Design a protein with these regions (language model features):
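Glycine-rich beta-strand-centered segment in the early N-terminal region that forms part
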Residues: 21-38, 50-92
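Adenosine-nucleotide cofactor-binding segment
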Residues: 162-227, 281-284
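C-terminal capping/lid region of NAD(P)-dependent oxidoreductase domains
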Residues: 290, 295-304, 312-332
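NAD(P)H cofactor-binding loop motif with strongest signal on the N-terminal glycine-rich segment
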Residues: 148, 224, 247
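Mid-domain Rossmann-like dinucleotide-binding core that forms the NAD(H)/NADP(H) cofactor-binding site
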Residues: 118-194
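Short glycine-centered segments of the SAM/dcSAM-binding site in methyltransferase folds
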Residues: 84, 142, 166, 240-241, ...
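NAD(P)H dinucleotide-binding glycine-rich loop of Rossmann-like/cofactor-binding domains
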Residues: 33, 45, 78, 84-147, ...
Length: 332
């Protein structure tokens, strides 16, 4: 089989398309013929050895896939060869075939494309866990979403509206603002590009405060980090919940007096660990996502597709934060 492999730490330019023996499923596993693989920010980090998961090299990046079952390992029940599935793999998805634990796979509805399926799990499962379990989001509350036109950002916007929140989208361009509005955001605010000095931080904080209104944001969803985090935190409501989802702009440092003054919570969101520790709760969330998908309340936005040999370009686009929605690699 063909696979796009990382042989050494580095950027997308270090990836090489190689031939490997076909993998075989072990006990409790399925072999999936990959038809589509979504690109996410962890793919940027994992090939540079900057992610918490560090697979032995050589390895293929690609953390979520859609495809068809080609073979079934011992003890697997409920699946047959040819079934259409989606799964989060962590890595290994940028290959023609990948072995997946059967318990980690979900059935892809026949009416949905492989491209859509590959773009669903990681971003939407992260966002529903963040908003409901960590953020305790309630109908009528105000949700501020940073980076609202990215994969997890658009998912948070759609889910916020599905749960009847007032959603304020914060983005870096008018094009991204329109994408957030199209996803259902009640309002969108365009913030300048960082980094910021102290005066710039004050301007940014005021921008967020004006966007959410005098009562503040009940929940703030932050997949951006960097200088945006503190500025956003200053717009939080009394007893609000600030969700740390990611930090492509850098790991933020917060003055903790702000949390005291607002009596607010700063909550980390590590969906992968949650799914491993509480698989039943995660499976329930995924079933909810499928229901919302069928109802048309959520819909993964795939802005571009790439062939396997050009997957490095997709990873670079994610790294440079040029993407609206999701990028998907299609594998024929």
């Amino acid at each position: 089989m063909r696979a796009l492999l990382s042989h050494e730490p580095g950027g997308p330019e270090t990836l090489r398309l190689d031939e490997l023996p076909d993998p075989e499923p072990g006990s409790g596993e399925i072999l999936v013929r990959v038809r589509a693989a979504a690109i996410n920010f962890p793919d940027v980090l994992i090939i540079e050895d900057k992610y918490q998961l560090k697979p032995p090299r050589p390895f293929a990046p690609g953390g979520e896939i859609a495809g068809e079952i080609e073979a079934i390992g011992e003890g697997v029940q409920g699946w047959t060869v040819g079934d259409r599935v989606i799964a989060v793999t962590g890595f290994g998805g940028l290959a023609e075939k990948v072995v997946v634990p059967a318990r980690a796979a979900y059935r892809l509805p026949e009416e949905r494309s492989f491209e859509e399926g590959a773009a669903l799990l990681l971003t939407y499962a992260t966002s529903i866990h963040a908003l409901l379990d960590r953020g305790k989001l309630q109908a009528g509350q105000t949700l501020l979403v940073l980076g609202a036109a990215g994969g997890v950002g658009l998912a948070a916007v759609e889910l916020g509206k599905a749960y009847e929140a007032r959603v304020i989208a914060a983005v870096s361009s008018e094009e991204k603002a329109q994408a957030a509005r199209d996803a259902g955001a009640d309002e969108a605010v365009v913030y300048p590009q960082g980094p910021f000095d102290k005066d710039g931080q004050k301007v940014l904080a005021q921008l967020f405060k004006e966007a959410v209104g005098p009562a503040g944001a009940d929940v703030i969803y932050d997949p951006v980090g960097g200088d945006y985090t503190e500025a956003a935190l200053r717009s939080i409501a009394w007893e609000g919940r600030f969700l740390v989802v990611g930090f492509p702009a850098g790991i933020a440092k917060l003055p903790l007096n702000l949390t005291l003054l607002k009596s607010c919570d700063v909550c980390g969101v590590f969906w992968g660990a949650f799914a491993a520790r509480d698989p039943k709760a995660n499976a329930a969330h995924v079933e909810t996502l499928f229901k919302l998908w069928r109802q048309g309340m959520i819909s993964p936005k795939v802005s571009a597709t790439y062939p396997l040999e050009r997957a490095g370009e997709a990873i670079r686009a994610i790294a440079e934060r040029r993407v609206i929605g999701k990028l998907v690699v299609t594998i024929d």
